[in-house]
Amino acid sequence: SFQCELVFAK
C-alpha cells in the first residue's frame, strides 16, 4: 500500500 497505511495500520 502506501505510507498512511503503515502509520495508521487499521
Curated annotation (Swiss-Prot):
GO cellular component: chloroplast stroma
Highest taxon listed in the record's lineage: Eukaryota
GO molecular function (one): ATP binding
Induction summary: By water stress.
Parts forming coiled coils: none
Compartments (UniProt record): Plastid, Chloroplast stroma
Keyword set, alphabetical order: ATP-binding, Chloroplast, Nucleotide-binding, Plastid, Stress response
Function: Activation of RuBisCO (ribulose-1,5-bisphosphate carboxylase/oxygenase; EC 4.1.1.39) involves the ATP-dependent carboxylation of the epsilon-amino group of lysine leading to a carbamate structure.
Protein family (similarity comment): Belongs to the RuBisCO activase family.
Stated name of the protein: Ribulose bisphosphate carboxylase/oxygenase activase, chloroplastic
Lineage, highest ranks first: Eukaryota, Viridiplantae, Streptophyta, Embryophyta, Tracheophyta
